[in-house]
Amino acid sequence: MGKVYDWFEERLEIQAIADDITSKYVPPHVNIFYCLGGITLTCFLVQVATGFAMTFYYRPTVTEAFSSVQYIMTEVNFGWLIRSVHRWSASMMVLMMILHIFRVYLTGGFKKPRELTWVTGVILAVLTVSFGVTGYSLPWDQIGYWAVKIVTGVPEAIPIIGSPLVELLRGSVSVGQSTLTRFYSLHTFVLPLLTAIFMLMHFLMIRKQGISGPL
């Protein structure tokens, strides 16, 4: 085992990387409220795991979406628990994100030189809300259907580009299969990928600049 470790250590300097990760200075003013961002990340990871598990059974069609969710809840082993954890962690993620934003704002964590960290955080907040909007529609029940119809109809008030934008969101003039397919694709692929990218940028900047000092 020692020889294997030495082989990797010689090429990758694993010990130096480990020392850098474990020996980062933590300011004395840091308290439990500085953990809100980490809790938000944890909720996101739970979302990814439980969401991935449900993709094995969920069917993104207007005729089968609702019945597939019912199947997950009633027939799949621990399916009810997986979906419930997914919903609970979604609510927790939004709550922790809001509290994290307040903490950063109140402690001045958005000020120079951390402006870009704040910008990526705002983008992550928008992505988090987008998760909620797209995920809410996936069961394709009455609530989900009408929520999608209302949300996708909002841009229609924008002059000139309103109607084309609505059609782009819905995939057609009216809400239907194309809309569900778009929302499913956004919820399970596009948004998670963008979130992972911006989270990585967010954490790398925090790692580089350190935690902001007290007011």
From Swiss-Prot:
Family annotation (PROSITE patterns): CYTB_NTER
Residues that bind heme b 1: 100, 202
Record-listed heme b 2 binding positions: 86, 187
Entries under InterPro entries matching the protein: Cyt_b/b6_N (IPR005797), Cyt_B6_PetB (IPR023530), Cytb/b6-like_sf (IPR027387), Cytochrome_b_N_euk/bac (IPR048259), Di-haem_cyt_TM (IPR016174)
SUPFAM superfamilies named among the record's database cross-references: Transmembrane di-heme cytochromes
Function in brief: Component of the cytochrome b6-f complex, which mediates electron transfer between photosystem II (PSII) and photosystem I (PSI), cyclic electron flow around PSI, and state transitions.
Gene: petB
Full protein name: Cytochrome b6
GO molecular function: electron transporter, transferring electrons within cytochrome b6/f complex of photosystem II activity; metal ion binding; oxidoreductase activity
Organism, scientific name: Marchantia polymorpha
The family this protein is said to belong to: Belongs to the cytochrome b family. PetB subfamily.
Known cofactor(s): heme b; heme c
Chain positions recorded as heme c binding sites: 35
Lineage: Eukaryota, Viridiplantae, Streptophyta, Embryophyta, Marchantiophyta
